[in-house]
Amino acid sequence: MAKITQTMISQLLAAVGGSSNVSKCGNCMTRLRLTLANNGVADQAVIKQIPGVMGVVESDEQFQIILGPGKAQQAAELMNKLIESVINGDVQEQAMASDTNDLSSVAAEQKKQMKSKQTSAVQRFLSKFATIFTPLIPGFIAAGLLLGFATLLEQMFVLEQTPSQFILDLIAYMKVFGKGLFAFLSILIGYNAQQAFGGSGVNGAILASLFVLGYNPDATSGIYSGMSEFFGYTIDPRGNIIGVLLAAIIGAQVERKVREYMPDDLDMILTSVVTLLIMGVVTFVVIMPIGGELFKGMSWLFLNLNDNPLGAAILAGLFLISVVFGIHQGFVPVYFALMEAQGFNSLFPILAMAGGGQVGASLALYFKAKKDAVLRTQVKGAIIPGILGIGEPLIYGVTLPRVKPFVTACIGGAAGGFFIGLVSYLGLPVGLNTVFGPSGIVAIPLMTSHSGIFAGMAVFVVGLLISYVVGFLATYFFGSKDVDLS
């Protein structure tokens, strides 16, 4: 696979319209995420021809370039440095612009095409979830892995024998990071959410803290807020992540509106004060009760879907499509709801089956292709990340461009999801021990169940194998016909 080089980044920057068209440059695990002043200027055809680019996803405010695992962050750093150099006059963009086939001449045509495929309001909304949750994913994974290893040590050395004090201390040490993360996670999410929707992150963090504080003066745990009611109104901090998101999103809109009317000289002093006073009332009186009911309803819906083999198959089968559109982060609030309802995330292993179907489909294409085919090289470069749980290189480099294998990959994922749902229906739901984590084989030590981690790990592995096999067979016999295998 192509390396991230200065030349490649220069070509990408030119193809999206130059530094003047890039308002913000960031990344997630596999994608370079750009906020462009004018999406119509970006030449997708040119971008897709640049070596190392696996695909392009446009989601209203974000223009996403898929580069693969381990490359997106490097690309974002190089592009930000290049943009800064251009702004400072250290680098001229003239040389870069020559590679774009006169972007200004095609901008008008591109703009017309973009207007014809406007994204939906739902897609625009869900795309912001990547901005909120992507920075938190490394912490979720780290806390989940440490908790998984701690639980494994517990089951091996604590439950059936007298452990040493060192083992007990080690287990407690590995668990403390997860407890710290989940104790204050709402505040981190509130900060990111309000910032993502155009407000000040610190105001979102303060609003989120209202859900963390305690309102019972007699409670023996937590941090007492100093108030047990709000002007005679009983405070019930329900809603969890749903309430926090609602408060931050609405808070961002209120803050922006207040700033419109606030004199510039008073903006820094009073805008946040007025915003918090307004949003405190809204949060205590409206958001907490409504958020609580929404949270309860979401938990009920997905608990029933996860315990139903058909529902689980549908969720797993459609998940790859949500990845293609870049809206898969929209499931994260559901993960929180399930963590609170079950003690683990039972949706994640179902959705992870989609990656298994992708691996099976890609292996089938590998064996169908001739020994000197470029397709084999593409599969070789992307199969290991796919097995480890990062499926975008396989999606954009192997299956999606050929369409049929993408469909059969979805079928493979659905088969694995059906198995996970069936086992849950029979009385053994399994799930991730943290909100979010890696999929693929890396997720095995993070699996758990009410019958222990070994049962959870075993069910997940069998489901993954089913996805591999069904994805392989469906693609080998049906998904590779009339498909470019060169």
From Swiss-Prot:
GO terms for cellular component: plasma membrane. SUPFAM superfamilies: Glucose permease domain IIB. The active site is at C28. Pfam families: PTS_EIIB, PTS_EIIC. InterPro entries: Glu_permease_IIB (IPR036878), PTrfase_EIIB_Cys (IPR018113), PTS_EIIC (IPR003352), PTS_EIIC_1 (IPR013013), PTS_IIB_1 (IPR001996), PTS_Sugar-Specific_Components (IPR050558). The keyword Heme does not apply. This is PTS system N-acetylmuramic acid-specific EIIBC component. It comes from Vibrio vulnificus (strain YJ016).
